[in-house]
Amino acid sequence: MRYVGIQSQIRSNNRKSALLLIAFPAILLGMMWVFLAAINYFSTGYYDQAGYFVNQLDADSVNLTFEKVAPWVVAGVAVWFVIAYFSNTKMIQHATGAQPLMRRENPRVYNIVENLCMAGGMEMPKVNVVDDPQLNAFASGIDKNSYTVTVTTGLLDRLNDDELAGVIGHELTHIRNRDTRLLITSIIFVGIISTVFALVVRMIYNRMWFGGFGSSNDRNEKGGGLSTMAVLIIGAVCAGIAYLFTMLTRFAISRKREFMADAGGAELCGNPLALASALRKISANPGLGNVERDDIAQMYIIHPKKLGQGLMEFVSGLFATHPSTEERIRLLEQF
């Protein structure tokens, strides 16, 4: 395996992650244009000499509508984003049941965090603990007032000081490199599009079962029941495609940040092998027993879901928030 220096890996992942993040608004606006174009195409055209209706796309009309609608969509998404962005810290704490950890309660953990912060030249984040026998840790927050490192009691019981320093160094690197802010941004964008997709699918379901598919004459008399259904189906397809691409983009962002956090954590604690050893122990029993939300699980140092084998490993790898633990350990052991 080709040797990749820690700083080189960090710079490379930063560039790639920045490009991936730009893709989110591009996907949203792109799918909106496709939706408008599809509606225009299926509702615009002319009859040929044989009397058949020929669909025709009026690109100028689509662009004009897009210019009128886009600002409203962007404004709505912006309001949604701001509300979700600034309420995420309380949501995460409530979902995980995390409680603040004070120095007098656990000086071992507090001192490790404090020493690593001094070594890295960064401010001390909050430290939370979750009473759970499983092994995991994660970083959260969007600014210095909300940055938090959370660990489980199972992690504290099973890891020695060097291994715990490696794990905490990993999480501090997420904070130092603003990964938590980046991941929260990606989670919110995916949540917005998934909500739109679910809403459109629900509207299609309601129309099918509560009056959307009457006879052909009924549809004509009512003035476009079928047209409305066609609009909803086109909307569902566009939202579904946008959801797929945003999910793939979000997962790619998360995987790259994990590699970078491993490299930064190893550099911060000065012992890559200790972090590799910690990952082996955590992989045997990862997760949080009372939390099943995938948007929170993607912040864990190891995701509790296992990758498949062979072809399924490739497919599941595309939809994985974390690279394989074995690959992460191999990279740490080469330093």
Where are these regions (language model features)?
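Active-site recognition of the HExxH zinc-binding catalytic motif
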Residues: 89, 113, 151, 166-174, ...
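Helix N-cap/coil-helix junction residues
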Residues: 122, 177-178, 270, 334
